Regions:
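Alpha-helical membrane-associated segments of multi-pass integral membrane proteins
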Residues: 11, 99-130
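Cytosolic juxtamembrane helix and N-cap/initiation of the first transmembrane helix
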Residues: 1-20, 128, 140
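Interfacial non-cytosolic loop connecting adjacent transmembrane helices
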Residues: 30-45, 88-113
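Hydrophobic alpha-helical transmembrane segments
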Residues: 49-59
């Protein structure tokens, strides 16, 4: 099987997920607004936004990178950032106690879903690349 055409596919998927995360946190998955005062939900949103931008940059570089070792490193980086994104709201940074507010009802599940998808895509690509690396006699 010729993998030359499939190589940028994972990078494009990772980039699309990263863009979805950044746009989502800025639009429909916003944190709650308690009297306009920055609270822990706003800080969690900012942390997710920053991690989403890092994921976007790694994903774009992953599309154009030709070195196999660097691609594996970029996949690992995106997978780890995806795990971080999934854990930021509610696990690493506490959110509001009210489960009906947007931070708990929308932002947290959205970030968990996209973060897990980023981790799965990056980790899956890394695993496939490591399996191909372990089989030196087969076509890469």
């Amino acid at each position: 099987m010729n993998n030359d055409k499939a190589r940028p596919l994972v990078g494009i998927i990772l980039t699309a997920l990263s863009v979805l995360l950044v746009v989502g946190v800025l639009t429909f998955a916003k944190p709650c607004d308690v009297h306009g005062v920055p609270n822990s939900c706003a800080w969690a949103s900012r942390a997710v936004l920053g991690a989403g931008i890092v994921s976007f940059v790694l994903s774009v570089v992953r599309i154009f990178e030709r070195d196999e070792g660097e691609r594996r490193g970029l996949c690992l980086g995106v997978a780890l950032v995806g795990i971080l994104i999934a854990c930021l709201p509610g696990v690493l940074i506490e959110l509001c106690a009210d489960a009906s507010l947007p931070c708990n009802a929308v932002m947290r599940p959205f970030c968990m879903g996209v973060g897990i998808a980023l981790a799965a895509a990056g980790g899956g690509d890394l695993t496939l690349r490591l399996v191909r690396l372990a089989k030196p006699n087969e076509e890469k």
